[in-house]
Amino acid sequence: MKAVIFAYHDMGCVGVTALINAGYTIEAIITHPDAPSEKTFFGSVARIAAEHNIPVFVPDDVNHPLWIARIKALAPDVIFSFYYRQLLCQDILSLPTVGAFNLHGSLLPRYRGRSPLNWVLVNGEQETGVTLHRMTARADAGAILAQRSVAITLQDDALTLHRKLCEAAAGVLEKVLPAIREQRCTETPQDESIASYVGHRTPEDGRIDWGQPAATLANLVRAVTDPWPGAFSYAGGEKFIIWKAQVRPNSADAQPGTVLSIDPLVIACGSDALEVQTGQSQQGVYMQGGQLAHALGLVKGALLNPRPLVSHKRRTRVLILGVNGFIGNHLTERLLRDGNYEIYGLDIGTDAISRFMVNPLFHFVEGDISIHSEWIEYHIKKCDIVLPLVAIATPIEYTRNPLRVFELDFEENLKIIRHCVKYQKRIIFPSTSEVYGMCTDPVFDEDDSSLIVGPINKQRWIYSVSKQLLDRVLWAYGEKEGLRFTLFRPFNWMGPRLDNLNAARIGSSRAITQLILNLVEGSHIKLVDGGAQKRCFTDISDGIEALFRIIENKDNNCDGQIINIGNPDNEASIRQLAELLLASFERHPLRQHFPPFAGFRDVESSSYYGKGYQDVEHRKPSIRNAKRLLGWAPSVPMAQTIDETLDFFLQTVDLPDAAQ
């Protein structure tokens, strides 16, 4: 059986060796060059390939059409991936006749993603293992062929556990490779209800928070100990690394981080204490804990810190253009509640943000982005993060005022992007679910779905294309000039303060606000083309929490990423939305103060939106990136969002004094 192997690290060596021993014909091995910044403690797949006269390649992008063609020419029966660090595209996965299989270092479906070896130790797990599974477009989600569990003892660290997993992998492959060759394997689908995801770990993850329990910190130490970068803290301004530690019972009422004794070196934690058995200072060598304490000049009662004392952390300055808008005002509320951010905002109105005006961390200027260009450039230079939230985003305006949409949504935002490039400021840019256009995928994926729009004479696409081009410009600036950016794509966010009823009166609002106005005024609810179009509605609180995590950007893992933010479980047609809204309206305490329901009326899109409109039948997001990068998933059901949105708008209507 002919195989093409994607492999790296010790697990790659184990996999290649197992295939050789099992009698597979290896047509090619694709691997990575060793990175100068990475401590190379593991075996070389390339060396094994050379010793066995197997062609070996190190492409920059294995998913490039040229490499896909080369792999196709090899006509593999089977593909194996052993700790290869790049996801393989569907075009590659579909090449082998038997299938493509991946070796993963956990007991799937738990701990999908990167670095499961370290994560299981961080989380104090007592068992892990290895899994050979069929590869699918979703990482680590395919059916399982074989697994082997590995016990984790308190004496295990990342390196000893890594060696155990390599041994387990060799055993799994020895058993299952003949069955794959003879095509007599049984496969078990993964249980999605217990799936979990973990992200890539960086050296920053080794920073010690002494407020955590000692057991948690001991797990962190063993999870990232040598040859990984290590768990670290600071004594004054000097960094030191802890290589080995153990929990010590402690009932003393001491502040976390306090040195309780020097030899042994024992430090108070959130509960119990941590004894440092070995470690080293930043400029020192590996040494015993007591000697490390002397080298650092520690005394009993000294206080250790997660960061050097000499560095004063100021609040992060965030510039929000369009701060009075739906997303802007809700985001401002979340950032101010956190307390670590200072907000600078610009908008042409203040109705939604008046509640923030007394907050000393909120600075507002009333103005237009097309006029206040100097103020904007100055504050881009001054701030750390820029969110340009100004845009015309109501469908009727795409056909009513297409040039204004282009001028504001594209031209003005392009100026802001270029200022961010000039001053090297991080930009978090609101893309849109509209960029997917008429994509036929069942779910829209940020990295793989095609962006399909209609003909030029359908002017409604000017918004989608303007946003898409800005997405591409940002991506190019990131690739060519190092711009730090994140694109987020909201999918039908709803909630209080979404537009206003006055905007709805002139047709310039989103769907739910327009529907509420119809109920308030007793006019027909117009369902464009029968309201059959399906959308996935997302509560504003869910959306803002995801956006807040993008701003936090832990581990910088949102840099250069595109992230859908939506709720695929809240899919409903516009007609269903209207029916749910009507039911909520009928049971509302203020219902009696409004006219009778006038009924639904189906209208053609051309009569409602005008010439040049074209609709989209469905729009459902993949939120794989949001789960993986943010640890986020939506939780608010659509019925709750509808109730809260309706109540907010009904409370804004002027009613007779008795009703008030």
Swiss-Prot record:
Origin species: Sodalis glossinidius (strain morsitans)
Site (Transition state stabilizer): 102
CDD domains per record: Arna_FMT_C (cd08702), Arna_like_SDR_e (cd05257)
Pathway: Nucleotide-sugar biosynthesis; UDP-4-deoxy-4-formamido-beta-L-arabinose biosynthesis; UDP-4-deoxy-4-formamido-beta-L-arabinose from UDP-alpha-D-glucuronate: step 1/3; Nucleotide-sugar biosynthesis; UDP-4-deoxy-4-formamido-beta-L-arabinose biosynthesis; UDP-4-deoxy-4-formamido-beta-L-arabinose from UDP-alpha-D-glucuronate: step 3/3; Bacterial outer membrane biogenesis; lipopolysaccharide biosynthesis
TM helices/strands, residue ranges: none
Positions with a binding annotation for UDP-alpha-D-glucuronate: 393, 398, 432-433, 460, 492, 526-535, 613
Quaternary assembly: Homohexamer, formed by a dimer of trimers.
InterPro entries, alphabetized: Arna-like_SDR_e (IPR045869), Bifun_polymyxin_resist_ArnA (IPR021168), Epimerase_deHydtase (IPR001509), Formyl_trans_C (IPR005793), Formyl_transf_N (IPR002376), Formyl_transf_N_sf (IPR036477), Formyl_transferase-like_C_sf (IPR011034), Lipid_A_modif_metabolic_enz (IPR050177)
One cellular-component annotation, GO: membrane
Residue(s) at site: Raises pKa of active site His: 140
Function field: Bifunctional enzyme that catalyzes the oxidative decarboxylation of UDP-glucuronic acid (UDP-GlcUA) to UDP-4-keto-arabinose (UDP-Ara4O) and the addition of a formyl group to UDP-4-amino-4-deoxy-L-arabinose (UDP-L-Ara4N) to form UDP-L-4-formamido-arabinose (UDP-L-Ara4FN). The modified arabinose is attached to lipid A and is required for resistance to polymyxin and cationic antimicrobial peptides.
Highest taxon in the source lineage: Bacteria
PANTHER family assigned: BIFUNCTIONAL POLYMYXIN RESISTANCE PROTEIN ARNA, UDP-D-APIOSE_UDP-D-XYLOSE SYNTHASE 2
Assigned keywords, A-Z: Antibiotic resistance, Lipid A biosynthesis, Lipid biosynthesis, Lipid metabolism, Lipopolysaccharide biosynthesis, Multifunctional enzyme, NAD, Oxidoreductase, Transferase
Annotated EC: 2.1.2.13, 1.1.1.305
Active site: 104, 434, 619
Region (Formyltransferase ArnAFT): 1-304
Catalytic activity: UDP-alpha-D-glucuronate + NAD(+) = UDP-beta-L-threo-pentopyranos-4-ulose + CO2 + NADH; UDP-4-amino-4-deoxy-beta-L-arabinose + (6R)-10-formyltetrahydrofolate = UDP-4-deoxy-4-formamido-beta-L-arabinose + (6S)-5,6,7,8-tetrahydrofolate + H(+)
Binding site for NAD(+): 347, 368-369
Alphabetical GO biological process terms: lipid A biosynthetic process; lipopolysaccharide biosynthetic process; response to antibiotic
Positions that bind (6R)-10-formyltetrahydrofolate: 114, 136-140
Protein name: Bifunctional polymyxin resistance protein ArnA
Family, per entry: In the N-terminal section; belongs to the Fmt family. UDP-L-Ara4N formyltransferase subfamily.
Recorded GO MF terms: carboxy-lyase activity; UDP-4-amino-4-deoxy-L-arabinose formyltransferase activity; UDP-glucuronate dehydrogenase activity
